[in-house]
Amino acid sequence: MVKLTSIAAGVAAIAAGVAAAPATTTLSPSDERVNLVELGVYVSDIRAHLAQYYLFQAAHPTETYPVEIAEAVFNYGDFTTMLTGIPAEQVTRVITGVPWYSTRLRPAISSALSKDGIYTAIPK
C-alpha cells in the first residue's frame, strides 16, 4: 500500500517542477530581447577574457564596436539599459566577428536564451 504522504509529496514535487519551468517564447533572431541576451553574454565574456579581446582588437584595428558595449564592459552596474537600441545587424557583426564565437559565445548565448525560455526562429 502507498502512503498518502508519499502521493502528496510526489504531487507537490511535480507541481513545483511545472511551476519552475519557464514559459517559452519564439522570437526572431533580430528581436531586441534576443539581442539584449546576446549582448549580455558578450559583455560577460569580454569581462572574463579581456586580454584576449585586447589582443584581437590590436590584430584587427578596423573592427569597431558600439561605444555602448565598451561602456557596459567597464560599468559593473546594471548595463542592460545601455545596450538597448543597438541595431540587430551590428549586434550580429560584433558577436560573430570573433574567432571564439562558435566555441564559446554561441553555446553560452544558446544556454542563456534557453534559460530565459526564448527560442529563435528564422522568419518566413
Swiss-Prot record:
- Keyword Chaperone: yes or no? no
Which keywords has UniProt assigned to this entry? Signal
Output a single Gene Ontology CC term carried by this record. fungal-type cell wall
Disulphide linkage map = none
Q: Which GO terms describe its biological process?
A: fungal-type cell wall organization
Signal peptide from the UniProt entry = 1-20
- Pfam families named in the record: SRP1_TIP1
Query: InterPro entries this protein is in?
Result: SRP1_TIP1, Yeast_SRP1/TIP1_CWP
State one molecular function term (GO). structural constituent of cell wall
Q: Which family does it belong to?
A: Belongs to the SRP1/TIP1 family. Seripauperin subfamily.
Name the UniProt record assigns to this protein: Seripauperin-19
Question: Which gene is this protein's source?
Answer: PAU19
